[in-house]
Amino acid sequence: MLDGKQDNGNVDSVDIKQRTNGGGDEGDALGSNSSSQPNRVARMPVDRNAPYYNMNHKHRGMAIIFNHEHFDIHSLKSRTGTNVDSDNLSKVLKTLGFKVTVFPNLKSEEINKFIQQTAEMDHSDADCLLVAVLTHGELGMLYAKDTHYKPDNLWYYFTADKCPTLAGKPKLFFIQACQGDRLDGGITLSRTETDGSPSTSYRIPVHADFLIAFSTVPGYFSWRNTTRGSWFMQALCEELRYAGTERDILTLLTFVCQKVALDFESNAPDSAMMHQQKQVPCITSMLTRLLVFGKKQSH
C-alpha cells in the first residue's frame, strides 16, 4: 500500500545521458518511412528519471465515456446492461477526481470530431486523460451508432507530437467490446512537472505513455450481463473503488484480469456452445513510469 508521502515526480534528478549504441541502428521494417517531427518541444511534466508520473497537477483530467446501447445497424442488437457499466464507471472515476463526460450512442463522425476537439484543448493543468468505449466490436474494429471504425482512431490525435500538453502524461483507453467470435472454454487446473528542477530536457517517443486495455484478447468474445453489466467493467470498477488511490495501474489491472478470469463464467444453459465460457482482458502498456491515482493535493 502506498501512503500519502508517495513521490509523484518531485525527485532530485540524476544526470544520466541518453544511451547510445555507437551508430548502426536500423529499423526492422520494409518500405519507406515517415517521421513524426522529432524536433518539437513540449513542457516537461516530470523529471527524466522519476519513477512515478506527476499526478499533482491542478486537475486530474478529462474522462470521456462513449456508451453505445442502440445502433442503426440492423445486425447489431441493443447492448442491454451497458448503462450499468457507464453509470458505475462514471461514479468511480469522479471519486478519483476525473471530470467525466458521457456520450450516448454517437455516430462515427461525432466521435472523431470530439476526439479531435479534445486533443486540441490545453491539458497543461491535467494529470492525464482517460477514454472508455462501451460498444460492439470485431477484430480490428469498433462500432459507433452508424458504422464501424478502427480502434486506433481513438488515440491517433493524442500522440505527443499532436497533443503536446499531454506529452509525458498518461493516456488511458479502456475498451469493452468483442474482438471476434471465438469462445474461450477455459481449462481446469488441479493440484498434482516539475518547473525549476535541475533536470535536463529529454526526448520521448510520440507513442510513449499510452495504456490500452481491451476487455478480451484479439479474436475472442467479450461477455456482458444484462443486469449487472460487462464482466470487464464490473471488475475494473470494483478494483478502482477498492485500491484506485493505492495501487499502480498495472498492478490494479493485473487483479482486474484475475477477477475476470477466475470469478466469471457464462451462464447460458440453453446453449451448450455458449455455456460455461471464460474470458480474460488484454492489456497493452506503453507507460514509462508507475501510475497511481493518489488523492489530489489542494492547490
From Swiss-Prot:
Record keywords: Apoptosis, Hydrolase, Protease, Thiol protease, Zymogen
One Gene Ontology MF term: cysteine-type endopeptidase activity
Propeptide position ranges: 1-28, 185-195
Region feature (Disordered): 1-45
Entry's Gene Ontology cellular component terms: cytoplasm
Enzyme class name: hydrolase
The UniProt record lists the keyword Amino-acid biosynthesis: no
EC number per UniProt: 3.4.22.-
CDD domains linked to this entry: CASc
Keyword Electron transport belongs to the record: no
Active site residues per record: 136, 178
InterPro entries attached to this UniProt entry: Caspase-like_dom_sf (IPR029030), Caspase_cys_AS (IPR033139), Caspase_his_AS (IPR016129), Pept_C14 (IPR002398), Pept_C14_caspase (IPR011600), Pept_C14_p10 (IPR002138), Pept_C14_p20 (IPR001309), Pept_C14A (IPR015917)
PROSITE patterns for this protein: CASPASE_CYS, CASPASE_HIS, CASPASE_P10, CASPASE_P20
Name of one Pfam family that matches: Peptidase_C14
UniProt record, GO biological process: apoptotic process; positive regulation of neuron apoptotic process; proteolysis
PTM (free text): The two subunits are derived from the precursor sequence by an autocatalytic mechanism.
Quaternary structure (record): Heterotetramer that consists of two anti-parallel arranged heterodimers, each one formed by a 19/18 kDa (p19/18) and a 12 kDa (p12) subunit.
Family stated for the protein in its record: Belongs to the peptidase C14A family.
Protein function: Involved in the activation cascade of caspases responsible for apoptosis execution. Inhibited by the baculovirus anti-apoptotic protein p35. Cleaves p35 and nuclear immunophilin FKBP46.
Protein name according to UniProt: Caspase-1
Organism, scientific name: Spodoptera frugiperda (Fall armyworm)
Taxonomic classification: Eukaryota, Metazoa, Ecdysozoa, Arthropoda, Hexapoda
